């Protein structure tokens, strides 16, 4: 479990196909304090540490995970938003994030307004019921508040405001229009939608 508050930006240093894809990621984390088997969110994807050394950690990424995450994410040189798993007593600064990607979004536009970045992201119809104004959503592992929502023929578009600090401490500072991003809906929205669906069958 995570909070969507990024604590490091890692870089994919190397990949190797070993059945699953073995991915080594550089990090500023003190890896001596990271146990093998620990969970780390990598741009919104919960992965298990399978190897480590000073300056890097490694993960095995399944074909299923690769197929459900943003295109180009698992390539050398790619920057990743990193967050270690939430521990009892930690501050919950964002919202509850599971590290399970619900869908892929596409950055439609980025506009700088007063130092902040106004970003529009498009997603498919399967996510539309779960995106609400002033609700929470996780984009590439970052907990964000939705400013506005528009239903479209292709699904849904929503607006985000990225303040300078968030852009500086995440990969959003280098985000480009047309780029694919990992999306995770608010777990509370997921449960509420399920309850509403069951109520309709009663």
Predicted region positions:
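Conserved loop->alpha-helix
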Residues: 1-202
């Amino acid at each position: 479990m995570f909070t969507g508050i990024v604590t490091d930006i890692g870089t994919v240093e190397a990949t190797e196909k070993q059945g699953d894809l073995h991915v080594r990621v550089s990090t500023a984390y003190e890896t001596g304090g990271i146990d093998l088997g620990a969970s780390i969110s990598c741009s919104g994807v919960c992965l298990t540490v399978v190897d480590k050394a000073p300056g890097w950690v490694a993960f095995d990424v399944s074909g299923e995970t690769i197929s459900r995450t943003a295109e180009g994410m698992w390539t050398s040189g790619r920057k990743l938003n990193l967050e270690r798993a939430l521990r009892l007593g930690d501050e919950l600064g964002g919202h509850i994030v599971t590290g399970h990607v619900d869908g892929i979004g596409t950055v439609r536009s980025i506009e700088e307004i007063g130092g902040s970045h106004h970003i529009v992201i498009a997603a498919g119809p399967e996510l539309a019921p779960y995106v609400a104004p002033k609700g929470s959503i996780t984009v590439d592992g970052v907990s964000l508040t939705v400013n506005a929502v528009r239903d479209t023929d292709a699904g849904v578009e929503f607006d985000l405001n990225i303040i300078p600090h968030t852009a500086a401490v995440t990969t959003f500072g280098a985000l480009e229009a047309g780029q694919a991003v990992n999306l995770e809906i608010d777990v509370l929205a997921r449960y509420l939608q399920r309850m509403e669906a069951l109520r309709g069958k009663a």
